[in-house]
From Swiss-Prot:
GO annotation, biological process: formation of cytoplasmic translation initiation complex
Pfam families named among the record's database cross-references: eIF3_subunit
Region (Disordered): 1-113, 212-265
Principal location listed in the UniProt entry: cytoplasm
Gene3D superfamilies assigned: Eukaryotic translation initiation factor 3 like domains (1.10.246.60)
Subunit composition and interactions: Component of the eukaryotic translation initiation factor 3 (eIF-3) complex.
Record flagged with keyword Membrane: no
Function text: Component of the eukaryotic translation initiation factor 3 (eIF-3) complex, which is involved in protein synthesis of a specialized repertoire of mRNAs and, together with other initiation factors, stimulates binding of mRNA and methionyl-tRNAi to the 40S ribosome. The eIF-3 complex specifically targets and initiates translation of a subset of mRNAs involved in cell proliferation.
Keyword Mitochondrion carried by entry: no
Protein name: Eukaryotic translation initiation factor 3 subunit J
Subcellular locations according to the entry: Cytoplasm
Length: 265
């Protein structure tokens, strides 16, 4: 009977617990790095998605703006200017009159520039060192009415066609004053200022062109004077012949032939 008790004791003994495998330090660092990489990848993806959405929204806004007519853009510009003025008025109740006038002038100038952009096309407001300085034309009666001509594409020509357009715009504005006393003096000074930045070879070409034009003008004036002299001489000759004929007729009517009434007796 003793062996059976031993068997029971052996069956009742439980197996020893298995000790868990210990993780090494490098394994824990690898898991942390993997989690960081995953977080960085997700952050990069979110940034890419945000940039793509922003670019798409900007492109959609530009496309919608291009589809708008000029009248719609002008109307939106007026509404935007009115809204901006109202906001500035509400925010600057305590400002003095001088500051208010200066602010209104700046706002009007910005509004006029935007209005000119709507009328004449896109304006490059990112001026660099080579860009011309601002040429602001203001109304003497209302100083707040001012326009920067240098910002208009018309006054920033680069191609031959653009220079031709500039010429066709300025000439009709200037030549009507050619009969005024100071026009010729102004034209001389204006021409000097125009060629001031050119080299001597280009100035010589322009001077040669002016000489050619001067010679043509002289020929035209001489031809006109010659025609005028011929016409005047012809009129003088006709006048002399007519006067002589009238004198002869008058002498005949008056009996100025040297014969008296007694000569026939």
């Amino acid at each position: 009977m003793a062996p059976e008790r031993w068997d029971d004791e052996e069956d009742s003994v439980s197996p020893p617990p298995v000790a868990p495998r210990r993780r090494f330090d490098d394994e824990e660092e690898d898991e942390v790095l993997d989690s960081w990489d995953a977080a960085e990848d997700s952050e990069v993806e979110r940034e890419k998605a945000a940039k793509a959405a922003e670019a798409k929204a900007k492109a959609d806004a530009e496309a919608a703006a291009k589809k708008k007519s000029k009248s719609q853009r002008i109307q939106e510009h007026k509404e935007e200017r009115k809204k901006k003025a109202e906001e500035e008025d509400s925010d600057s109740e305590e400002e003095d009159d001088a500051d208010k006038r200066a602010r209104l002038r700046r706002a009007q100038k910005d509004a006029d520039l935007k209005h000119a952009e709507d009328l004449f096309g896109d304006i490059d407001l990112n001026r660099n060192r080579g860009a011309p300085k601002a040429i602001v034309i203001s109304d003497s009666a209302d100083p707040t009415q001012a326009v920067d001509l240098s910002a208009m594409p018309l006054f920033k020509p680069t191609t031959k066609e653009q220079f031709a357009r500039l010429t066709s715009t300025l000439i009709p504005l200037l030549t009507p004053h050619s009969k005024k006393p100071h026009y010729s003096l102004w034209a001389q000074e204006f021409a000097k200022q125009l060629v001031k930045e050119l080299n001597s070879a280009d100035v010589k070409k322009i001077a040669s062109a002016m000489t050619t034009m001067s010679n043509e003008k002289m020929r035209e004036e001489r031809a006109a004077d010659k025609g005028s002299k011929k016409s005047k001489a012809a009129k003088t000759k006709v006048s002399l012949v007519t006067s002589r004929d009238n004198k002869l007729d008058a002498d005949y009517d008056n009996g100025d032939d040297g014969l008296g009434d007694d000569d026939f007796m």
